[in-house]
Amino acid sequence: MSQERPTFYRQELNKTVWEVPERYQNLSPVGSGAYGSVCAAFDTKTGHRVAVKKLSRPFQSIIHAKRTYRELRLLKHMKHENVIGLLDVFTPARSLEEFNDVYLVTHLMGADLNNIVKCQKLTDDHVQFLIYQILRGLKYIHSADIIHRDLKPSNLAVNEDCELKILDFGLARHTDDEMTGYVATRWYRAPEIMLNWMHYNQTVDIWSVGCIMAELLTGRTLFPGTDHIDQLKLILRLVGTPGAELLKKISSESARNYIQSLAQMPKMNFANVFIGANPLAVDLLEKMLVLDSDKRITAAQALAHAYFAQYHDPDDEPVAEPYDQSFESRDFLIDEWKSLTYDEVISFVPPPLDQEEMES
């Protein structure tokens, strides 16, 4: 929020009162979820259309308050072409005592990868460019020691020039309920995170990229499981059942016992599964869709794979500034999280206008 307080105006949209600076005009609702509602708006200062998100009850509980602080800290930190960043953050409150609402402003992204896959069969060159950009964004995110956790086509925004941004970090851990049944939330999830096998690492995101890449190449969801067990069966049918080395790493005894009860299956030949695909694409998929997360390719390694030869530029694949997430282990009260969040709102410095390059 800029230093001198702007003039705000109030408007009711979908039974929610929005109180925003005059800079943002023509608000129109575009969606809402558990954690907030989003409006498209015209930013009179830049001439661009933006997305304004009003967080829902940001401080109603300690969990909400910490989530609000986490989302703001993450968005403020992200400064990369392939990752959604923060254009503005504001509150109508004039003081910490009045502070109850948080609004976040980001680029308005037109389509997501879901829309793109449904509409057209993609060429191999399209797939190269899209997956390259996801990995370029992931290298940046992972370098800050952040894991997205929820990469899927609907969390990848693409404009008409095929430029891509990663959205919606896995800020809130999904509940068991949201992961149950025939749901996309789970189809792109690495087995170790879906089934709580073990402590997971950044390569959970690489598994998701493999699932997305396979879908772009074939036009079909790779592992559309109807439930957790069906999902695991679909995965093991492709990549084979785990060997002794991986079984030893699975800390959950019940998961280990269940896997050992299944019939042994060999890994399929990916070239026979992805018929007609570029052999380099198939080779990369084999390195991403590895059951043992310790042996999965990293984002930085994947960028150097021959499949991306025409896009890879080691001097233009930046890493992030260090990100201090020591707050994650803190047990603060609501008012303490609220005060920390207020400080982050007040201290926000908007990006230079020429960085707002991506209009969709």
Curated annotation (Swiss-Prot):
- Per the record, residues carrying Phosphotyrosine are Y182, Y323
Domain Protein kinase positions = 24-308
- Record carries keyword rRNA-binding: no
The record's top EC class is transferase
Q: What's a single GO CC term here?
A: cytoplasm
Residues that bear Phosphothreonine: T16, T180
Question: From the UniProt record, which GO molecular function terms apply?
Answer: ATP binding; enzyme binding; kinase activity; MAP kinase activity; mitogen-activated protein kinase p38 binding; NFAT protein binding; protein kinase activity; protein phosphatase binding
Residues forming the catalytic site: D150
Q: List cofactor names only.
A: Mg(2+)
Keyword set, alphabetical order = Acetylation, Apoptosis, ATP-binding, Cytoplasm, Kinase, Nucleotide-binding, Nucleus, Phosphoprotein, Serine/threonine-protein kinase, Stress response, Transcription, Transcription regulation, Transferase, Ubl conjugation
Show the InterPro entries listed in the entry: Kinase-like_dom_sf, MAP_kinase, MAP_kinase_CS, MAPK14, MAPK_p38-like, Prot_kinase_dom, Protein_kinase_ATP_BS
Q: How is its activity regulated?
A: Activated by cell stresses such as DNA damage, heat shock, osmotic shock, anisomycin and sodium arsenite, as well as pro-inflammatory stimuli such as bacterial lipopolysaccharide (LPS) and interleukin-1. Activation occurs through dual phosphorylation of Thr-180 and Tyr-182 by either of two dual specificity kinases, MAP2K3/MKK3 or MAP2K6/MKK6, and potentially also MAP2K4/MKK4, as well as by TAB1-mediated autophosphorylation.
Q: List the EC numbers from the record.
A: 2.7.11.24
> According to its UniProt record, which reaction does this protein catalyse?
L-seryl-[protein] + ATP = O-phospho-L-seryl-[protein] + ADP + H(+); L-threonyl-[protein] + ATP = O-phospho-L-threonyl-[protein] + ADP + H(+)
Residues that the record marks as modified (N6-acetyllysine) are K53, K152
Which residues are ATP-binding?
Answer: V30, G31, S32, G33, A34, Y35, G36, S37, V38, K53
Q: Which residue positions does Phosphoserine occur at? A: S2
- What is the role of this chain? Serine/threonine kinase which acts as an essential component of the MAP kinase signal transduction pathway. MAPK14 is one of the four p38 MAPKs which play an important role in the cascades of cellular responses evoked by extracellular stimuli such as pro-inflammatory cytokines or physical stress leading to direct activation of transcription factors. Accordingly, p38 MAPKs phosphorylate a broad range of proteins and it has been estimated that they may have approximately 200 to 300 substrates each.
**What does the UniProt entry state concerning the protein's domains?**
The TXY motif contains the threonine and tyrosine residues whose phosphorylation activates the MAP kinases.
Q: Which family does it belong to?
A: Belongs to the protein kinase superfamily. CMGC Ser/Thr protein kinase family. MAP kinase subfamily.
Give the protein name, as stated in the record: Mitogen-activated protein kinase 14
Gene responsible for this protein? Mapk14
